[in-house]
């Protein structure tokens, strides 16, 4: 999770040394990693907080007409830089679409892994696994190289999908007691923040405060049957809830 405060803030460091382990979908991680916090000045922007988890709905009932109309104009980039209307990702199939905070985020890498662990269940049900991150295609490709994520990965450099879905953003939903515990747990489990990715221009300009979510959609571009909007960093729903929405 990228940390960005005023440039006058004291720089701190945290050193955590979990045991060497191999994580499904992420490869082998090494012990003895030093996490150095970097701070920059940012504008504090926060979208409206909208949290919902809707299953069994159809014909776009999980999102409102205004949101559905906004999504019609959203395009994301594949790993080669090709523009794709976001609704094409589920127009002809059902898909679980996870939205990362950013491509360097340790909590998002854990989210990617816990979804990838259930990819065989999704495959058996004909459900695609997709991850979208706000950032550049270079960041997206680095994420794939580092994590070995087996699903599809797309970049949203303009944050258009996040704004259309009204995902929450702000300091108060990034630095919370629960989020801090989630970060520590993630490090002890062997996950790692990529600080180089976290402090690239595409992420820093937004302050690193963006939160994500998960939706289940398709087939049919207006068929979003489940949507979960993160209330704070690391707010992952139970994987059983997602599987019930996509594969029951």
From Swiss-Prot:
It comes from Arabidopsis thaliana. Residues 1-52 form a transit peptide. This is Thioredoxin-like protein AAED1, chloroplastic. Gene3D superfamilies: Glutaredoxin. PANTHER family: PTHR28630, THIOREDOXIN-LIKE PROTEIN AAED1, CHLOROPLASTIC. SUPFAM superfamilies: Thioredoxin-like (SSF52833). The keyword Plastid applies. It holds the Pfam family AhpC-TSA_2. The lineage of its organism: Eukaryota, Viridiplantae, Streptophyta, Embryophyta, Tracheophyta. One of its GO terms (cellular component) is chloroplast.
């Amino acid at each position: 999770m990228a940390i960005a405060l005023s440039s006058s803030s004291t720089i701190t460091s945290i050193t955590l040394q979990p045991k060497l382990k191999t994580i499904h979908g992420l490869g082998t991680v090494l012990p003895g990693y030093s996490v150095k916090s970097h701070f920059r000045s940012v504008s504090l922007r926060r979208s409206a907080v909208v949290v919902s988890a809707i299953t069994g709905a159809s014909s776009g009932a999980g999102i409102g007409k205004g949101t559905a109309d906004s999504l019609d104009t959203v395009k994301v980039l594949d790993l080669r830089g090709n523009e794709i209307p976001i609704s094409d990702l589920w127009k002809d199939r059902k898909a679980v679409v996870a939205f990362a905070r950013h491509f360097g985020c340790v909590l998002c890498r854990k989210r990617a892994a816990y979804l990838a662990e259930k990819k065989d269940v999704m495959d058996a049900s004909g459900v695609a696994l997709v991850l979208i991150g706000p950032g550049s295609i270079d960041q997206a490709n680095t994420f794939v190289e580092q994590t070995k994520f087996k699903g599809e990965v797309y970049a949203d450099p303009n944050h258009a999908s996040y704004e259309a879905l009204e995902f929450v953003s702000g300091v108060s939903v990034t630095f919370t007691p629960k989020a801090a515990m989630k970060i520590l747990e993630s490090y002890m489990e062997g996950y790692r923040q990529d600080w180089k990715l976290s402090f690239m221009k595409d992420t820093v300009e937004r302050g690193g405060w963006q939160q994500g979510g998960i939706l289940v959609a398709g087939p049919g571009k207006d068929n979003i049957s489940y949507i979960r909007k993160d209330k704070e960093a690391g707010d992952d729903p139970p994987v059983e809830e997602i599987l019930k929405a996509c594969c029951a």
